[in-house]
Amino acid sequence: MPKRRDIETILVIGSGPIVIGQAAEFDYAGTQACLALKEEGYKVILVNSNPATIMTDTEIADKVYMEPLTLDFVARIIRKERPDAILPTLGGQTGLNLAVELAKAGVLEECGVEILGTKLEAIEKAEDREQFRALMNELGEPVPESAIIHSLEEAYAFVEQIGYPVIVRPAFTLGGTGGGICTNEEELVEIVSTGLKLSPVHQCLLERSIAGYNQIEYEVMRDANDNAIVVCNMENIDPVGIHTGDSIVVAPSQTLSDREYQLLRNASLKIIRALGIEGGCNVQLALDPDSFRYYVIEVNPRVSRSSALASKATGYPIAKLAAKIAVGLTLDEMINPVTGKTYACFEPALDYVVTKIPRFPFDKFESANRRLGTQMKATGEVMSIGRTFEESLLKAVRSLEIGVHHLELNEAKTAADDVMEKRIRKAGDERLFYIAEALRRGVTVETLHEWSQIDRFFLHKIQNIIEMETVLKNHPGDLDVLKKAKGLGFSDAAIAALWNKTERDVYALRRQEGIVPVYKMVDTCAAEFTSETPYYYSTYEEENESIVTEKPSVIVLGSGPIRIGQGIEFDYATVHCVLAIKQAGYEAIIINNNPETVSTDFSTSDKLYFEPLTAEDVMHVIDLEQPVGVIVQFGGQTAINLAAELEARGVRLLGTTLEDLDRAEDRDKFEQALSELGIPKPAGKTAVSVEEAVAIAEEIGYPVLVRPSYVLGGRAMEIVYNREELLHYMEHAVRVNPQHPVLVDRYITGKEVEVDAIADGETVVIPGIMEHIERAGVHSGDSIAVYPPQTLSDDVIAKITDYTVKLARGLHIVGLLNIQFVVAGSDVYVLEVNPRSSRTVPFLSKITGVPMANLATKAILGAKLADMGYETGVCPVRPGVYVKVPVFSFAKLRNVDISLGPEMKSTGEVIGKDVTFEKALYKGLVASGIQIQPHGAVLLTVADKDKEEAVELARRFADIGYQLLATNGTAETLKAAGIPVTVVNKIHSASPNILDVIRQGKAQVVINTLTKGKQPESDGFRIRREVENGIPCLTSLDTARAMLQVLESMTFSTTAMTEGLVRS
């Protein structure tokens, strides 16, 4: 079937901000799809609220709308643009749910818009648990016994029939939100209540738990001609019961016999045909390891996290082909872009093993519940490729950047046997390391299988790794053993530890003896046909397939897995850096290991190496390619942290020199630079012991800001108000010693301002200045940022500009620079300087029109900004107001305090743009998922230090007709100021207490500022956790004040005439 000529304009819905369960894989899919549709000659309109994406760049679609992904705003765009069709299957759950809403609201019918790709009925059949179950029964495909419930009573009735354990899955939610496994009544009540609340249709599926079965996934594609193929099948190492997004996954499956493989393949193809899906689809199945029994778990009728993984694992571009299928092309008429020869209807064949390991945010959230279950908790993932499972697994482990270079974890090493067993029986994010430790202690594979339900095949493979450790230990310096160990994926660091040598010794020995990796190509066809894609992985074999060209090359280091503090913004900068290198006439080579992103799409760079970002793995590529130099500015802290080791090994770093990077990162050198330049910063010193920290704090006066040196995303940063808190911090958050000093600074309450600049050694271009709504002390990544600044005087802006230019020149910055200032009155202090690309680069590039990463790269390669038409200073302000609003994933992470502070907690961001600040902020808040109600009740419970300030806010809430509810202390203050208020009891008092009010939906907004209680049992903590009920809870009065401004601009004030007279 040729492509359709009856449609011209297509609206593509993006997936919005990054949250747990919906990350960068949709930027990758959406970018691919928009480009594919443009390639076929269609006009593409994109709507997405996430400014950090490549897909919202103006060149990706013909028109880009960065507006909230809500029924209201998307309907406006449809009415204005009148597209012929809409493609929702690339926007994740957000896109699917919006399509369903637009159809139900009659907007699509009213404007004559057709849904492309998977039809609405198919989406509903796959997503609605009841319809799906009916279809499976019709097809004779087995599903676990289950019941659809809408209330707790119905849940009890089902459990009485089949008994515990049962799995709860809410309908139409993302990443298993609200779901879980219940083994008793208490868990049933809790999980079912939350699940019903979080499901937009108040419906949950309860099913018999088949936890412990092997979990297998098939990624399938089908076109309108009913051609269907399996792109890739994958096996979860963790058994059923753990969300596939939190599971370690291998492709292709390792434990299936041919009969099992065919059985599940046929079921998957039968299901995609019955659903009539046109495009990509993911089928999840559970297989009983001891018989041929299997169950269908679920189907995702859209591009998903698994399809991004399958695309990168096979090289087969699912999203691109899905978009073309949506406009009528068929698999047998499209060429597979990887080989350039075979058609897309050839099923990919793999001659290597791919391993994906999730990256969890628990290094940021120490108190979070680390147990894994049906609700997803990972923020990102890494992928690695090897010739054997062992090699692939070890490469993935060292890609995670969790401070381990092998299957070894200190906590596991020191754990008592009973603790170890518990950690293996109840899966957490570190289970793999405990299994390795158990094998070292002589626990048998059989016992481990019984504890973990993990297939014996994988346990035997891990045992191979452990046995090799012993061989290495017994044969120090033996070259044959060294060769075998490298073949199993051992890192130099792991071998060095077993041989009591340094990592560089092992590396030197290998080079001298010629024990170095070769690079193999990912070609989708197991080398059956020649392939055109320069996409490589390393392995220890004979033949090298990566050919070095004559053209001078530049290597760019990517930013690795997405985690809190280092998100998709860095991938955005990496991609733009690569494009600029190509424009400058060099060959662009990228090294990265994140399967979700655009940077690891093989069509982005001239060569892609899918490798761990460690000194050893990066050096291997450098040794082969001999580049002009390496760029580390765009890969976040991941790349910056490799700079010193690479330079020590003789690598040329391009852009800002290592010495200058160090001057910005090292506290004492930085202070010296500031005093030479005459730029003020808050008083503070460096401590190398607990006693010293206390002495410094008492000298400069509390409150102080404490943090370790060299961190990203404010890890382990805190504001402490007295000696006791400081001691608690020193004991729990950091291990202070002369190698790891702790910084103690005076905490200044003021406005925080953030600036990004581009410098080439002479010219310093400042695209824009952003003012933060939350005062200093809230991490910049968690603050609402506004451009242009709304309250800064010309004098302050001039100071900020002057300091920025002085710093860029004084630190000899070549490339990008990010500075955070705090403004108190007319004084401007520098808080910190990051000599690299930052989180705000995509946002600023888009709203100011200055292509920051592109200019910075050209400056790094030696071009002058003045020759490109830029001059020193702030660029002219663009019309309009733009806000960047952070988005959090708290509903997925239990036991995490949502209060904002110096430690970053947001996973993503959205943009709001309009003509006034209030309108822009309204859009930003709505896009971030905060429901803004023009009337209702606000519940206030604030710390003593905030009471005075809260009075003015409360009065303004009352003036626009909001009812005020408050706890005792706060209520007294309000009454004293003559403001009417209803008292609500504290948590431990009689009903209706504060939690009842929130749970019954009697408050539309909660404002709760920090009473010092970080522990889960404090009242404030429990109030703030009510985000699980989906009510906006603001923990900073600045955010509340901004929201009030929005509400005031939406409502008319109603005051009686006499009131007006009395007040004046």
UniProtKB/Swiss-Prot annotation:
Family that this chain belongs to: Belongs to the CarB family.
Biological process, per Gene Ontology: 'de novo' UMP biosynthetic process; glutamine metabolic process; L-arginine biosynthetic process
GO CC annotation terms, alphabetical: cytoplasm
Keyword Transmembrane helix tagged: no
Gene designation: pyrAB
Pathway info: Amino-acid biosynthesis; L-arginine biosynthesis; carbamoyl phosphate from bicarbonate: step 1/1; Pyrimidine metabolism; UMP biosynthesis via de novo pathway; (S)-dihydroorotate from bicarbonate: step 1/3
Listed SUPFAM superfamilies: Carbamoyl phosphate synthetase, large subunit connection domain, Glutathione synthetase ATP-binding domain-like, Methylglyoxal synthase-like, PreATP-grasp domain
Boundaries of every MGS-like domain copy: 930-1064
Entry's EC annotation: 6.3.4.16, 6.3.5.5
Pfam families: CPSase_L_D2, CPSase_L_D3, MGS
Ligand binding (Mg(2+) 2): E298, N300
Positions that bind Mg(2+) 3: Q820, E832
Binding site for Mn(2+) 2: E298, N300
Free-text comment on this protein's domains from its UniProt entry: The large subunit is composed of 2 ATP-grasp domains that are involved in binding the 2 ATP molecules needed for carbamoyl phosphate synthesis. The N-terminal ATP-grasp domain (referred to as the carboxyphosphate synthetic component) catalyzes the ATP-dependent phosphorylation of hydrogencarbonate to carboxyphosphate and the subsequent nucleophilic attack by ammonia to form a carbamate intermediate.
Tagged with keyword Metal-binding: yes
Entry protein name: Carbamoyl phosphate synthase pyrimidine-specific large chain
Domain of life of the native organism: Bacteria
Region annotation (Allosteric domain) ranges: 930-1064
Binding site for Mn(2+) 1: Q284, E298
Binding-site residues, Mn(2+) 4: E832, N834
